[in-house]
A protein has these predicted regions:
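Terminal catalytic/cofactor-binding subdomain
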Residues: 1-137, 144-148, 177-187, 191-194
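Generic recognition of stable, solvent-exposed alpha-helical segments in well-folded globular domains
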Residues: 26, 82, 86, 127, ...
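Short conserved micro-motifs at the rims of enzyme active sites and ligand-binding pockets
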Residues: 42-45, 81, 114, 164-165, ...
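A glycine-rich phosphate-binding loop feature that marks nucleotide/adenosyl-phosphate handling sites
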Residues: 106-108, 206-210, 373-383, 430-440
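Extended, compositionally biased alpha-helical segments that mediate assembly or anchoring
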Residues: 427-527
């Protein structure tokens, strides 16, 4: 049965064909710096890239070697991908003989000691970022923090929100309406994100060095030497127990049925001590190895496949920003770096994501119960580990059904929103993107995870050799790519500006670190 909001969107779009032309997007792409031999770079953040603390487009994530590239908000896919390509080209001018690792799961690593924590200078905000990362390392191990991914930021056009709100009666505030609709999108995303893992998962194997000394896994050796560990039908080990995962957080029941519950759950996790973390110093005698001894140091520590977001003011917590203004956009966090695309993702993926997320927004989205969430978690874990297994079934309404059938039905619904996007733009690009995903459902060998394993097996490549092949291929691609003079000048200017901004921050500090942290955490208490 067609949902009210699907019918509404089709009716509104028919009367206003350009209603969906202004989708706002942004991409955050992480990449490890590596040596020519495929080992994790031990060098500091390249000076030519400016300050990782204050640069608008180039920063670091957990490790000094884990670069993160950020595109500005844009309504054009070509503009977003073009900007991301320019950032890559610029970065390669500063890397010397280093390369960017073309996979999500890390290259050759020598344990936690071989993963340098990111440094941001001497200001309070810089120290807070580094101490937070030290805490993550103590709590989960540094190895998990060396995993790279792609985050996709999405928000429908303002014209859409205004038209939908008015059509639904304009009851209450428009922002409350928008927030409630985003929460519905998030609940449906949790119901169907397994499909994204199947279609775009690109981490079915890992380098054996990633699991050295660990016995808590059931991966199989892929080669006689045991250099590569894998699961034959896995899609995205990054999204499972070996990747971004936390046993301690399993009991954290985050509710997306209303914003108040979401904020309260995370606030309590940030302010309530967690006995297992009391062993790590959090300010005693001025020694900081973590920001606090709570279940979460800050809200970013909560691992999730999607986040509700609002741009925060300087010094403002993410939760405070959401309380202040409601949800402004969502951040999809379950995308692996695609080794077969120079940028790690491509236009087809973005067009499908737009159609998928719009589908999540306009389908009915009843409140989610803990029992349903447990089923959804099981479905996701099943697809992570066994997504391409012949005859695989998932839990659906009315019992277990084949993944292929559930995926086919979901893609039919996504094709309807793709058709509306195509009508708005006067082309067939979104429907073509959906058709490409339908082909992956019909033939599992067309998925990135299957293509990776097939190439590794055919050419006798261990994981790190496969990663080096594509890392070197894309390094050559970006080193030979022309970077327009205005783009080069803008990035060089931003690097210089960021260094000056860091110096100004360091000179402007007036509080000691303990007082700075106390003032920051007062925001959570006030939520």
């Amino acid at each position: 049965m067609t949902s009210h909001w699907q019918t509404q969107l089709e009716r509104l779009a028919a009367g206003q064909p350009t209603l969906l032309t202004g989708i706002r997007r942004g991409v955050e792409k992480e990449s490890l710096r590596i040596s020519p031999e495929g080992t994790l770079a031990q060098t500091p953040h390249p000076p030519g890239l400016g300050s990782a603390l204050t640069h608008g487009s180039i920063t670091t994530d957990y490790s000094e070697a884990l670069l993160e590239f950020i595109t500005p908000v844009s309504t054009g896919i070509d503009e977003t991908l073009g900007t991301l390509a320019d950032i890559h080209s610029f970065v390669y001018r500063q890397l010397g003989n280093e390369r960017l690792w073309a996979l999500s799961m890390p290259c050759i690593v020598s344990g936690d000691a071989g993963i340098p924590v990111a440094r941001y200078g001497s200001s309070n905000v810089a120290r807070m970022k580094t101490v937070y990362r030290l805490g993550l390392g103590h709590r989960y191990g540094r190895m998990m923090q060396a995993i790279a991914g792609i985050h996709y930021n999405f928000s429908p056009p303002e014209a859409f929100w205004e038209a939908a709100w008015q059509d639904d009666g304009a009851q209450g505030s428009r922002q409350d309406y928008i927030t409630d609709r985003y929460l519905g999108l998030i609940r449906n995303f949790h119901r169907w994100s397994w499909l994204l893992i199947y279609l775009f998962g690109a981490s079915p194997a890992v380098c054996a060095s990633f699991l050295r000394g660990r016995k808590d896994h059931s991966l199989e050796p892929m080669d006689p030497e045991g250099n590569t560990l894998y699961r034959p039908h896995a899609t995205s080990l990054r999204m499972g127990g070996l990747g971004y995962n936390s046993e301690a957080q399993r009991g954290l029941a985050v509710c997306y049925n209303d914003l108040d519950s979401y904020l309260k759950t995370l606030k309590d996790a940030i302010l309530t001590p967690h006995p297992a973390y009391a062993q790590f110093p959090s300010g005693e005698g001025g020694d900081y190895e973590q920001l606090n001894d709570s279940l979460l140091q800050i809200e970013n520590e909560f691992y999730s496949t999607i986040r509700p977001k609002r741009v925060a003011a300087s010094g403002e917590t993410a939760l405070t920003a959401l309380r202040r203004g409601g949800i402004e956009y969502i951040e999809v966090r379950c995308l692996d770096v695609n080794p077969f695309a120079p940028l790690g993702l491509d236009e087809e993926t973005i067009r499908f994501l737009d159609a998928f997320l719009l589908h999540c927004l306009v389908e009915d989205s009843p409140p989610c119960s803990p029992a349903e969430q447990a089923v959804l978690d099981e479905n996701l874990a099943t697809v992570v580990d066994r997504g391409r297994e012949p005859g695989l079934t998932l839990a659906g309404t009315g019992g277990r059904r084949p993944l292929s059938a559930l995926a086919g039905e979901r893609l039919q619904g996504i094709a309807r929103t793709a058709a509306l996007l195509d009508a708005a733009h006067g082309d067939g690009a979104c429907r073509a993107a959906v058709a490409a995903q339908e082909a992956k459902v019909q033939d599992t060998e067309a998925t990135p995870s299957a293509r990776m394993l097939a190439e590794m097996g055919r050419d006798g490549l261990p994981f790190y050799r496969f990663g080096l092949r594509y890392s070197e291929r894309w390094a050559q691609y970006f080193r030979e790519r022309t970077l327009a003079g205005d783009a080069l000048a803008a990035l060089e200017a931003e690097s210089e500006r960021s260094l000056e901004a860091q110096r100004e921050l360091e000179a402007a500090d007036t509080l000691d670190f303990a007082s700075y942290l106390a003032a920051y955490y007062d925001q959570y208490a006030a939520l």
